[in-house]
């Protein structure tokens, strides 16, 4: 029952969700996300969605998931045609109307060792984008440690298999009777 209520958009904004202590955002974030998703889909009526469109779609959905921030990871292979745009996706996102892009941790995956010039370029991009993104992931090393790796949890602390589940959780000890 408590889990269904936490995911229910029908709770009034500001209502405390039983069993969790979270505060409901109401249906406002869902309404806003659906309008933006419709605009995004309509803008691509005559063409395929880009990877950046999919990033926006994923992050817009992420804004509706719960009454507190949800985390996603977005991964892009280094050298991809959209990698530069991806690397800068969060730049000024809180002032340019794309605040939903703040939902994901964006990382570039390297399957071969990058050159010093590539790393310098990546660090310059990180600095230009605000200082923290994109992250970069050494997929060769990850596959040595976990040959089945297909992705990672949002902060890239865990290697995950395809459709794998992150097992990190948070316990609020004050909610347990002593």
Task: Report each predicted region and the residues it spans.
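Hydrophobic alpha-helical scaffolding
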Residues: 20-27, 47-51, 108-113, 154, ...
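Conserved helix-loop functional segments at active or binding sites
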Residues: 43, 67, 173-177
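Sparse, context-dependent recognition of short Cys/His-centered cofactor- or disulfide-binding micro-motifs
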Residues: 15, 46, 60, 121, ...
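Function-dense linear segments that define catalytic or interfacial modules
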Residues: 1-19, 126-178
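Conserved structured core elements
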Residues: 24-35, 51-55, 59, 116-120, ...
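Flexible, glycine/charged-enriched surface loops at secondary-structure junctions
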Residues: 2-5, 44-56, 65-76
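Conserved, charged catalytic cores of large soluble enzymes
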Residues: 28, 32-42, 60-143
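A structural-propensity feature for long, helix-poor, extended segments
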Residues: 2-48
């Amino acid at each position: 029952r408590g889990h269904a209520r936490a995911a229910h958009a029908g709770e009034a904004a500001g209502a405390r969700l039983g069993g969790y202590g979270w505060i409901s955002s109401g249906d406002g974030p869902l309404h806003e996300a659906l309008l933006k998703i419709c605009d995004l889909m309509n803008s691509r009526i005559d063409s395929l969605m880009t990877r950046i469109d999919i990033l926006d779609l994923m992050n817009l959905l992420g804004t509706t998931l719960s009454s507190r921030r949800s985390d996603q990871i977005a991964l892009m292979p280094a050298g991809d045609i959209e990698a530069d745009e991806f690397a800068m996706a969060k730049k000024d996102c809180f002032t340019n109307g794309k605040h939903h892009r703040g939902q994901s941790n964006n990382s570039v995956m390297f399957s071969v060792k990058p050159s010093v010039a590539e790393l310098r370029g990546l660090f310059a991009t990180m600095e230009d984008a605000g200082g923290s993104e994109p992250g970069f992931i050494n997929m060769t090393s990850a596959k040595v440690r976990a040959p089945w790796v297909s992705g990672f949890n949002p902060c890239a602390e865990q290697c995950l298999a395809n459709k794998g589940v992150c097992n990190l959780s948070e316990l609020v000890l004050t909610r347990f009777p002593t």
